[in-house]
Amino acid sequence: MPDVILVLVFLLAGLLCVRAAAGRWPGLVGGTVEGGRRTGFACRVEPTVMPTDDGSVEVLAIQMCGRIQAPRNRYDTNVQVLIADVTEGTNHPQPVLCTDEAWQMEDSPAFCLVAHNGPIPRRVAVLANWVQVATIPCGVLVFPHRGVRRLQFVVSLHGRRDGRMIASASTLYSFTNPKPGYLDEREVQPSSPQPIEVLMLRLAAGVCQNDGVLPDAVVSLLRDWIVSQAEQAIAEGPERDAAVQYLEGRLDEALSLAQAGRLDVDGTADKLARQASIVDRYQAAGLVLQAVGAEQAVLRHRTDRLMRIAGRLGIDREKFRAMAQKCLPMHTHRVEDMCFLLGIEPKMDADERRQQLNQEYQKWNARVTHPDAAIRQQADRMLTLIAEARSRLADEPTVVQA
């Protein structure tokens, strides 16, 4: 039965971003050449060796070439590089993780490189020769499985101030991964009494229960999550129905344990930390935050518990907070909740709080003109929260979060 219900793992924010990139930019694989002159925007990957103090390392050189159309002359840009593992097909991309935090997505360990590219000199510019935009050491990349992997690299140019995408291209590249992948590590773990998905459900239920009771909105969200997981992994038919039935049964068990006061949240998080891959752990954290967000309220004891759970799962605090900003309600008026969402620590003095709020303001203000409507809406909500925090917290000598 565990073989039937184990579902395809998706890295909540990271994979969504990679899949969105693949969806927005289909068919932009390379460019075309007419009369020896390249038209369109293109990218490619070149393997090479880079010397180091200790010898050398294998790297992947990412290059771009071709036509770039900007809104105006001297339009300042950033370059972004994303990588997806499409060995199972472009309709089933899996995230490529990165061990270097500088090249990770804001809210997950999935690879994402963003660097300043500089101004585009004219509205229409053509790179006649290949230009290198990044060199990625192979050793920092973590793939789903060992062996030959088919990778999709997506290179895009975005406005530095407004986030507008002005050029994009993708290319496919085969890479042989000699090390176990993050899903291989999951498969070789000792057999668990419950599959990873059961532990995820127990963790979310345990965090959200109040005196043994889970709000109906949370239970509904968890049941929808079960169906979604099965639909992503299993073709329609008896096996999918069996997987849904199995996981719903385990959720009912978790609800009974919560009612009896016997649902061990910390112990469940520790089991996930031991048995689950990093992808599973981020997915578990994302499910917990979605469940808490479904309540439309974040209570003080729960924010403490959330940070403790993140620590037990081995998730970076700042990445967890970025995930929380996407999932948790923004209409809070509690000082404790504002501090949690905006990264204000009790030990900060007034100057440090103002600096933290300024950093958050700069980050979100840069997104108010983003081409993605969902990001614009989130930016508006965050800026409203920051304004309230400034009026209530910035000049206080201390902030008591209790």
Per-region residue spans from a language model:
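Small-residue-enriched hydrophobic alpha-helices in membranes
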Residues: P2-Q209, V213-A402
